[in-house]
Each structure stands twice: as C-alpha cells, then as structure tokens.
Amino acid sequence: MGKRTPRELRLRRHNRIRKRVFGTPERPRLNVFRSHVHIYAQVIDDTVGHTLVAASTNEKGWSGSPELTKTQEAALVGKLIAERALQAGITKVVFDRGGYKYHGRVKALAEAAREAGLNF
C-alpha cells in the first residue's frame, strides 16, 4: 500500500469527526468545504439529508473583490451564511470543520459566523 494523499487523510479525519457530529432539525450542522480557490459553507439537517442554507465564494454575483485575500473572502462567506441561517430561523448549529485544521480560512469563516449571530 502506498503513501496516502493529503485528500485521503482529510477524508479519514472527516469520517472520524462525522461519527460524533450530527445535525438535527433543532441544531443543524454547519459544514465547511475548502478548495484551493473557493470556500463553501452549508447548513445541513442530517435527519433528512437536506441542505437548509448555503453560501460560497463560487456563487453567481459574488461581491468579492480582487484585492481581498482568501481568508477575508472566507470571513465574508461566514457572515453571509449566518445571515441566511438567521433569516431561515436557525440560531444554533453544530460546526463541522470537514477534516480541516481549525486555522486560517476555516477559522475565519467560523469566527465571522459567530460574530454575525450563529451559536456554536
């Protein structure tokens, strides 16, 4: 068996985390996916497997400017997902970092969502 790729290692971590992190209708899961260029956030009800709200830097009409860093854009996505969740009546979530370290863009998104009113 060869050396595992960073993607395989992240997926193993994510599966390990998902054994404990589960979204309910009262407290859905805030999931984060980070690609090299974009960052995506979804609020998911795992009991039925539905995405309740979503936000990303890959959306049509994204208002990010070329002067912003990826970390600053992640903070804007965090604020946007929190605003959309609050409009949908969601105040409490369970944070799922997706196997990524709680650092950099993932941390910026989470802190911006907390500041905008989401509790986790």
From Swiss-Prot:
Q: Which CDD domains match?
A: Ribosomal_L18_L5e
Q: Where is the signal peptide?
A: none
**Which ranges of the sequence are coiled-coil?**
none
Q: Does the keyword RNA-binding apply?
A: yes
Q: Which GO BP terms sit in this record?
A: translation
User: GO molecular function: any one?
Assistant: 5S rRNA binding
- GO cellular component labels: cytosolic large ribosomal subunit
Family named by the database record: Belongs to the universal ribosomal protein uL18 family.
Q: Which HAMAP family match?
A: Ribosomal_uL18_B (MF_01337_B)
What function does this protein fulfil?
This is one of the proteins that bind and probably mediate the attachment of the 5S RNA into the large ribosomal subunit, where it forms part of the central protuberance.
Subunit arrangement? Part of the 50S ribosomal subunit; part of the 5S rRNA/L5/L18/L25 subcomplex. Contacts the 5S and 23S rRNAs.
Check the record and name the NCBIfam families matching this protein: L18_bact
This one is known as Large ribosomal subunit protein uL18
